Amino acid sequence: SYQMGFGGKGANQAVMAGLLGADTYMIACLGTDVYRDMTIDNFKEKNVKTDFIQIVDGSSGVAPIWVDGNGQNRIIVISGANDQIDSKKAIKSLGEIGNVSLIVGQAEIPMEVNYEVFKFAKRNNITTIFNPAPGRLLDEQFLENVDWLIPNETEFEIISNTNLTKENILK
């Protein structure tokens, strides 16, 4: 069967924070396609402020997900507008928001943007949470600016360069 829903790591995390009543802003880029207005409307319905969503030419980021008979998923990330987010604009947005206490990031945008935003956060005593999806090796300098790292089992294997077996977990 086919279903379409809103998502992306950053969007899902912002929506949950908004639904829980947190003062939540989404800093992102969306394309000039059919997903733009639907996504902005969804954020607004879920108590996520959209003042700092930039609209750029081209497609929005999408991620078709296939789930096999064993419940394992396969995700193809098509970055689209996500690749156009700019660290200077993101940091400027944080300054305009003011009094930011928490930043949540993820690897579906360019890592250099995460680097700069998380360095800004560390300099300004802002707590950071990083969801390393899609999984990739993370630079030690970047990790120094991460307060909470929340990988799933596959991402943990990639980050730690370890097979996640019972024996390795118990070591």
Q: Which sequence ranges carry the predicted segments?
A:
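Conserved phosphate/ATP/ADP-binding segment of small-molecule kinases
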Residues: 123-171
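Surface-exposed amphipathic alpha-helices with a cationic face
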Residues: 18, 115-123
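Short gly/ser/thr-rich secondary-structure transition/capping motifs
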Residues: 47, 83-88, 128-135
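Glycine-rich phosphate/adenosyl-contacting loop at the front of the ribokinase-like
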Residues: 1-29, 34-38, 44-45
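A glycine-rich helix N-cap at a beta->alpha junction
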Residues: 42-57
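Short beta->alpha connector loops
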Residues: 32-33, 108-112, 132-136
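Conserved phosphate-binding/catalytic loop of the ribokinase/pfkB sugar-kinase fold
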Residues: 29, 55, 65-102, 107
